[in-house]
Amino acid sequence: MQQDIVNDHQEEAQGWKWEQIKEIIESGELARLKRSRQMTDKYHEHKKRTAGLDMNQYVLQKLGWSLDEPQLENAAAKAFSSSTLYAVRANDFPYNFEPGVVHLVLWSKVALPVHSPDKAVREAARARMNAFLQAQPLLRPLLSSGHVAWFVNYPELQSVARIFHAHVLLFFPRERYSAEQVKTTVDDILSHGFEPLA
């Protein structure tokens, strides 16, 4: 089940710093990335309001997708090849990060085996994801500054386990970006989506 609150009071008050976030992702200690107590409460309230509808079905309805669609052959190599295969959304219940970190979720009908025990398979899946993000014009300024990161939670940490999704984090340092610039960039991403990967 998805991890909930953070335990350390300092982390709770400040949220994870960008460099800490990248270190945690690199280390693979993804269970350390959690929601704040306030956001966790909102998440549980949401689950109560949608009682009887599991989170997988809830997300499918929001995306207008079905799990009954045919599976692609050589799926990982075709991930993100068409805009009909994925969708990017703001995380309704973001993790506890410092101000300036925008938490998006990239939903995909094609599951990338980023945690495969087979190293070659795992590396190919990660390379596909990296190539997809690097191909996005709206992300280029952030990518060039090292201000884009992503991760896929381990299955035991996922609250929506039946639909592949990656957490995409964008960092807008407050000394370089105004609130209006951040809003404009994020609104552009959410309204236009990401471009498919050839």
Curated annotation (Swiss-Prot):
Q: Which sequence ranges form a coiled-coil region, renumbered to this chain?
A: none
Instruction: Tell me any Pfam family this protein matches.
Output: DUF3605
Where is this protein found? Answer: Cytoplasm
InterPro entries recorded: DUF3605
Q: Which UniProt keywords apply?
A: Cytoplasm
Cytoplasm: present as a keyword of the record?
A: yes
GO terms of biological process kind? N-acetylglucosamine metabolic process
What's the protein here called?
Uncharacterized protein YPL067C
